[in-house]
Amino acid sequence: MRSLLFVVGAWVAAAVTHLTPNAALATGTTPTVGANSTADPGTGANGTTVPAAGTPANSTTAAETPAPFPPVDFALPVVIGGLCALTLAAMGAGALLHRCCRRAAARRRQRAAYVYA
């Protein structure tokens, strides 16, 4: 039973450690400029205005749409979950096989005791 808890705990830990950094990126927070930054992107070297980066007003390209939430890759948690399922299935099959073998051995001992008695 301890191995079952270990397998489930490992899956949960892997899912949490894999999803936590991606969830922080999915919030849409942008990095802030350092406090000692003095560059002003709005003016050029000679005082003229520099156009802002991005698409021009007459461009036909659409604005970028946000990705659906959660925009994370579930490959690692799915693989680990699949391994957990296989492990649990193997544990169940092993327990069933062990039970059947014990019953068969008990029947053999019973027959041997009856024959040689």
From Swiss-Prot:
Keyword Signal among UniProt keywords: yes
Transmembrane spans: 74-94
Compartment annotation: Host Golgi apparatus membrane; Host endoplasmic reticulum membrane; Host endosome membrane
Family of this protein: Belongs to the alphaherpesvirinae glycoprotein J family.
Cleaved signal peptide residues: 1-26
Pfam families found in the cross-reference section: Alpha_GJ
Top-level division of the source organism's lineage: Viruses
Side of membrane Cytoplasmic, spans: 95-117
Residue ranges with Polar residues bias: 27-40
Residue spans, topological domain Extracellular: 27-73
Region span, Disordered: 26-64
Role noted for this protein: Inhibits host cell apoptosis. Induces an increase in reactive oxygen species (ROS) in the host cell.
Protein name: Envelope glycoprotein J
Topology with respect to the bilayer: Single-pass type I membrane protein
Gene assigned in the entry: gJ
Listed GO CC annotations: host cell endoplasmic reticulum membrane; host cell endosome membrane; host cell Golgi membrane; membrane
Positions annotated with a glycan in the UniProt record: N36, N46, N58
Keyword terms: Glycoprotein, Host endoplasmic reticulum, Host endosome, Host Golgi apparatus, Host membrane, Membrane, Signal, Transmembrane, Transmembrane helix
InterPro entries: Herpes_gJ
